């Protein structure tokens, strides 16, 4: 569930239920704070949405513009699904989703154009467009996790997270920088070149680990945790770069795939 909060006159989020409960437990969020979920017709008190229970254990709460990406590491993987993806994946896994992403890619280009001018003139990224773009990326991460054999199961069609062990969140900033907006014109130079060079070598290593992981699952039904973490780190690093380039975040992406 993706929850948005109304703080300091701005809609911020999305957050997960666990993150909201952690904020309630830490006292950084008042029980009467207004919250909203896409299934609700109007804003309600946050405790009505997540209940009065507050968790006190450590839960990762992203700062503004921070990208949080998770792919669950399974204790065991299915050999049958692995072989199905290897021999028939292009038919039932790659082509159907890729066709959707081609169409969505056209829409995303228009969204980026609208968002750029909106930030330049108003200092704000339209909330509806922000949610749409984020939801497309959440779908793509869910799909790519299966293509890369990091998760079993078929990725659900549709926008947003689906609670299937793969999730990606970007905490929407309350204010967007016009300066960063203008700087995006030069993003291919100061973002694309340094990060592209690093990711090129990471992706080469990722291809080698993809093959190694395939045979590890085939013979042992287990995907080595360190290899899984590295591959997820590639996704996380790439998504941070995409979030900055597409103005979902003003945080310059770190040169790391670590959480």
Predicted regions and their residues:
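Protein-protein interaction regions
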Residues: 1-72
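Membrane-proximal intrinsically disordered regions of secretory-pathway and membrane-system proteins
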Residues: 58-259
């Amino acid at each position: 569930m993706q929850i948005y909060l109304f703080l300091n006159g701005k809609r911020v989020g999305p957050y997960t239920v666990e993150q909201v409960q952690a904020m309630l437990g830490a006292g950084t969020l008042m029980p009467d704070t207004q919250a909203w979920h896409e299934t609700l017709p109007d804003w309600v008190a946050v405790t009505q949405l997540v209940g009065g229970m507050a968790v006190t254990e450590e839960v990762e709460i992203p700062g503004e513009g921070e990208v949080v990406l998770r792919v669950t590491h399974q204790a065991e993987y299915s050999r049958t699904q692995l072989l199905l993806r290897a021999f028939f994946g292009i038919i039932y896994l790659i082509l159907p989703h890729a066709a959707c992403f081609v169409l969505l890619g056209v829409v995303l280009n228009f969204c980026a154009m609208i968002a750029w001018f909106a930030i330049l003139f108003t200092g704000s990224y339209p909330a509806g467009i922000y949610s749409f773009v984020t939801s497309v990326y959440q779908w793509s991460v869910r799909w790519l996790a299966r293509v890369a054999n990091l998760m079993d199961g078929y990725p659900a069609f549709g926008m947003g997270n689906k609670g299937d062990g793969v999730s990606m969140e970007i905490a929407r900033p309350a204010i967007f920088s016009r300066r960063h907006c203008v700087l995006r014109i030069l993003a291919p130079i100061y973002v694309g070149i340094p990060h592209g060079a690093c990711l090129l070598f990471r992706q080469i290593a990722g291809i080698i680990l993809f093959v190694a992981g395939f045979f590890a699952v085939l013979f042992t039904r287990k995907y080595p945790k360190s290899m899984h973490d590295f591959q997820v780190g590639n996704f996380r690093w790439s998504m941070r770069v995409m979030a900055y380039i597409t103005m979902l975040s003003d945080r310059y992406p770190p040169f790391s795939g670590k959480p």
